[in-house]
């Protein structure tokens, strides 16, 4: 059977949550036993988001095959079992790159290359390649309906309906129904105008997901259905929720998956939502909390660390804990402002995530030193592993000017330097060590205990590595190199001796990209466990101190 397509579009405003909506639909269909694949088309002209600022685009999600993609692919992988590749994320820039390459080769045989049919055909071909050996392909169109940039993609999905028919294509439109407090009522006009915009392009939506902060009444749903030409049951309340893991359950309650089955004429079992219900139950019924301090360069824009935050949530839920994140600006730890160090004193674990450039590095080193000297559980990822190595070289090995050649090309001690195969390469786009690489772990290490094996594969995104000329000296001082590539070329994991520090681990790869709510990543689960143990020790120590103050001789008899 050929795959059926669900096309997800958005209207009124951006950032309504199309990615989460698409992922939640995919999740529900998988629970019904269907095989699903997910795809995202972004209307910007960049070939990929790899060189875009985290402040503009947010996180860059890396797939096993090394593609640098939109953060929505992270939602897709966390909510479904789809194994995504570069075929699952396309941009206008990449589509045009393909077309121009073909034109230069002469593939178009001298024809005038135009948006229709050449651009739309390229888009449709990409959609069809991602729909092989699956029951349903869910395609999200980025941007907002009405934007000039999105028009070729909207036209392409209109043509897909013409080619494949109504039984094989479904249009899901996410829109906004705002509540106007002054008037005391929900307003449907933005939704009506958004659908009108879609209709003007030739698309009649089949299902409307109405983003709102309260449940839509039967009358409101009826009004939207009447003016937007959809069935009453196809007007769905996409209500704001406190936890994103509620979204699939909310959609199921509203009958979204049932409607998909009906419109696409699919036959499948009822979904088993037990495990998702358990996750949501844990979210709202934790036994305790854990506080993690994240020392980062982009902390004012949390989407820069989307997968990281979710992986910490997954690790916390595995221990039935509520996660509280303290975002610590790395540059703040370079100042004499005591409030930043006060933040460090109140966290149960410290994490330094990935990043690029010199800004904030000194603050990260100060935070890492605090974690090492005060025995606070530490987890360094990518840049966090590199800075941990630099801090150790400086403050334990006595290599005062130790640094990375990225931050100081003239440093006498290049503890971190550019990947050997990238020396002389000046282009930034797609030139890093990307994608899944094998790693061998040392038995008995924190990492090996967490994974339960000594052979793993993790995703990478970096252009600098640990300089093995310093390995022997730093190992003698107490730094353990517990993870390497199978051939020993690259250092992948460093740790402190477990007798010297309860939990101190840095990894060159990005484990957050493989964590899921139902399958928390072992390293995040271990880090949260160590952080909570540290919290318990701190609490007991504080209680003993308070008790000793209360029982001092001068207080007795008062």
From Swiss-Prot:
Allosterically activated by GTP, when glutamine is the substrate; GTP has no effect on the reaction when ammonia is the substrate. The allosteric effector GTP functions by stabilizing the protein conformation that binds the tetrahedral intermediate(s) formed during glutamine hydrolysis. Inhibited by the product CTP, via allosteric rather than competitive inhibition. Its EC number is 6.3.4.2. This is CTP synthase. It comes from Koribacter versatilis (strain Ellin345). Catalyzes the ATP-dependent amination of UTP to CTP with either L-glutamine or ammonia as the source of nitrogen. Regulates intracellular CTP levels through interactions with the four ribonucleotide triphosphates. Residues 539-558 are annotated as: Disordered. GO terms for biological process: 'de novo' CTP biosynthetic process; pyrimidine nucleobase biosynthetic process. ATP binds at residues 15-20, 72, 239-241. Pathway: Pyrimidine metabolism; CTP biosynthesis via de novo pathway; CTP from UDP: step 2/2. GO terms for cellular component: cytosol. Homotetramer. CTP binds at residues 14, 147-149, 187-192, 223. Coiled coil: none annotated. CDD domains: CTPS_N (cd03113), GATase1_CTP_Synthase (cd01746). The keyword Metal-binding applies. Mg(2+) binds at residues 72, 140.
């Amino acid at each position: 059977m050929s795959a059926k397509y669900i096309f997800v579009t958005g209207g009124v405003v951006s950032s309504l949550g199309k990615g989460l909506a698409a992922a939640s639909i995919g999740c529900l269909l998988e629970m019904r036993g269907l095989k699903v694949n997910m795809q995202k088309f972004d209307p910007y002209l960049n070939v990929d988001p790899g060189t875009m600022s985290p402040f503009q685009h947010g996180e860059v999600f890396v797939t096993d095959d090394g593609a640098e993609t939109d953060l929505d692919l992270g939602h897709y992988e966390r909510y479904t079992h789809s194994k995504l590749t570069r075929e699952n994320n396309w941009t206008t820039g990449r589509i045009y790159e393909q077309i121009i390459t073909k034109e230069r080769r002469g593939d178009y045989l001298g024809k005038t290359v135009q948006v229709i049919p050449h651009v739309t055909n390229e888009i449709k071909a990409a959609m069809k390649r991602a729909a092989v050996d699956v029951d349903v392909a869910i395609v999200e169109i980025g941007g907002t309906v009405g934007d000039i940039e999105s028009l070729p993609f909207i036209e392409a999905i209109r043509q897909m309906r013409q080619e494949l028919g109504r039984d094989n294509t479904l249009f899901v439109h996410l829109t906004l129904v705002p509540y106007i407090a002054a008037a005391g009522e929900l307003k449907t006009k933005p939704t009506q105008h958004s659908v009108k915009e879609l209709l003007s392009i030739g698309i009649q939506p089949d299902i409307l997901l109405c983003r709102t902060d309260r449940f839509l009444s039967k009358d409101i749903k009826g009004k939207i259905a009447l003016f937007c030409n959809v069935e009453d049951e196809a007007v769905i309340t996409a209500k704001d929720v406190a936890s994103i893991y509620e979204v699939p359950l909310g959609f199921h309650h509203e009958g979204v998956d049932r409607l998909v089955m009906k419109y696409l004429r699919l036959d499948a079992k009822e979904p088993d939502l037990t495990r998702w219900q358990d996750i949501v139950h844990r979210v709202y019924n934790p036994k305790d909390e854990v506080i993690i301090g994240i020392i980062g360069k982009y902390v004012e824009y949390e989407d820069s660390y989307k997968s990281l935050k979710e992986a910490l949530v997954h690790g916390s839920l595995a221990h039935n804990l509520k996660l509280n994140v303290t975002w610590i600006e790395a540059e703040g730890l370079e100042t004499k402002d005591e409030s930043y160090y006060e933040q460090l004193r109140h966290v149960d674990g410290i994490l330094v995530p990935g990043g690029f450039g010199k800004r904030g590095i000194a603050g990260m080193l100060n935070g890492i030193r605090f974690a090492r000297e005060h025995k606070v559980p530490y987890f360094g990822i990518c840049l966090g592993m590199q800075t941990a190595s630099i801090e150790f070289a400086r403050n334990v090995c006595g290599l005062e000017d130790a640094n990375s050649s990225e931050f100081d090309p003239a440093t006498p001690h290049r503890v971190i330097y550019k990947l050997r195969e990238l020396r002389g390469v000046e282009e930034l786009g797609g030139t890093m060590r990307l994608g899944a690489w094998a790693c061998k772990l040392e038995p008995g290490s924190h990492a090996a205990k967490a994974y339960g094996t000594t052979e793993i594969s993790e995703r990478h995104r970096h252009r600098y590595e640990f300089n093995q000329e310093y390995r022997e000296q730093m190992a003698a001082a107490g730094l353990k190199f517990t993870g390497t590539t199978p051939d020993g070329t690259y250092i992948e994991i460093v740790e402190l001796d477990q007798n010297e520090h309860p939990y101190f681990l840095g990894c060159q790869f990005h484990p957050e990209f493989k964590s899921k709510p139902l399958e928390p990543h072992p390293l995040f689960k271990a880090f949260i466990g160590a952080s909570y143990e540290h919290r318990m020790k701190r609490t007991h120590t504080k209680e003993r101190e308070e008790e000793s103050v209360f029982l001092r001789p001068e207080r007795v008899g008062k």
